[in-house]
Amino acid sequence: MTLFESINAGGTQILGVAWPTVWALVRILVVAVVILLCVAYLILWERKLIGWMHVRLGPNRVGPAGLLQPIADVLKLLLKEVIQPTQASRWVYLVAPVMVVVPAFAVWAVIPFQAGAVLGDINAGLLYAISISSVGVYGVILAGWASNSKYAFLGAMRAAAQMVSYEVSMGFALVVVMMTAGTMNLSDIVGSQMRGIFASHGVTFLSWNWLPLLPAFVVYFVSGIAETNRHPFDVVEGESEIVAGHMIDYSGMAFALFFLAEYINMIVISALASILFLGGWSAPFEFLSFIPGIVWLVLKVFLLLSVFIWVRATFPRYRYDQIMRLGWKVFLPVTVIWVVVVGFWIMSPLNIWN
């Protein structure tokens, strides 16, 4: 009996019919706290890594090696006043940051951390993740409109157009994964990558989807960078053009919620990419399978997050027209063609996903 099964059995004996509700709330709270800690230290890792790339030390003053810097940043934001513009629509202005951050948390309901460790193991998990992650754009649009600022509204319109453009390509990339796995359950998609000729010979990483579905993987990950408005696709909040975009009139914790949502979405994109294309919690080689699956998933997510940061430190920002051209004239045709190619591949005698 696993640790979770033991806790579940003991809780049922103590609380009876109330235990399932209590256990669900405990799991949600634990996941939320872990996500918040991950975001805090992801920001520190980003500042450290970019500092090293710039031949600097990065934050190193607060605590040993700067490890308490995230706590200092949170305290600073908590103590700042949320100043509301006089011409702003009060309630919409305050609700918009919440509408951005809630979907970012809600996606984690279906993301499995290892076999059996998921808040909600639903069959349409992939569809749920795509749908709920698309809702955040409404909060961005409302933030730009409610601020009653032309710069904020321009940033919000850019965000809406950019997110819609890249969601189409991202959706087709995920359709390819669904076709090969034959399911939308995220746990089953990971299981489908642990079978095949290479996996039977102990070389599991060659059975992962990244190899046969490489174009879809590249399109998904780059579209994920654009979806999160990260550099080099950060024209939504282009500092040299419209300052902070839709967040220009926000301060204090209201401003922090937008950044919280951005970094949570970075982790979501990396986690989904790891699950859909990099085998999730499976070890790259059979002889390493003694290491807990959650360790492998965390390592893969950390690697992809580091790529996010590396791209920010090395690439110049695209112009808005270049971003739209990349989404509609490059990524969309590539993913549509790849859907057709994989469809014929599955129907042919060379099908490797049987």
UniProtKB/Swiss-Prot annotation:
Membrane topology annotation: Multi-pass membrane protein
UniProt cross-references to InterPro entries, sorted A to Z: NADH_UbQ_OxRdtase_su1/FPO, NADH_UbQ_OxRdtase_su1_CS
One Gene Ontology CC term in the entry: plasma membrane
Catalytic activity annotation: a quinone + NADH + 5 H(+)(in) = a quinol + NAD(+) + 4 H(+)(out)
Entry superkingdom: Bacteria
Family annotation (HAMAP family): NDH1_NuoH (MF_01350)
PANTHER family recorded: NADH DEHYDROGENASE SUBUNIT 1, NADH-UBIQUINONE OXIDOREDUCTASE CHAIN 1
Self-association state and partner proteins as the record states: NDH-1 is composed of 14 different subunits. Subunits NuoA, H, J, K, L, M, N constitute the membrane sector of the complex.
Name of the featured protein: NADH-quinone oxidoreductase subunit H
Taxonomic source organism: Paraburkholderia phymatum (strain DSM 17167 / CIP 108236 / LMG 21445 / STM815)
Gene encoding the protein: nuoH
